Amino acid sequence: MVKLRLKRCGRKQRVIYRIVAIDVRSRRDGRALRKVGFYDPIKNQTYSNVPAILYFLEKGAQPTVTVHDISKKAEVFK
């Protein structure tokens, strides 16, 4: 099963999260199937590759609660 979840990147005290499609059994920072966006909580910036997100959702991927909320704010789910 595939999930859309956050992968931690950046440096100490300056975190950035990538939104990735990843297998459920993989670790948080494990190898992702595809990068579909990023989220910067400090600058409150978000970038989402909407066609890629919709593709994975059509294939049965489940977003985590946080990714769902971020996507909702970015108006991926209308």
From Swiss-Prot:
The keyword Ribonucleoprotein applies. InterPro entries: Ribosomal_bS16, Ribosomal_bS16_CS, Ribosomal_bS16_dom_sf. GO terms for molecular function: structural constituent of ribosome. It is found in: Plastid, Chloroplast. GO terms for cellular component: chloroplast; small ribosomal subunit. Belongs to the bacterial ribosomal protein bS16 family. This is Small ribosomal subunit protein bS16c. It comes from Amborella trichopoda. The gene is rps16.
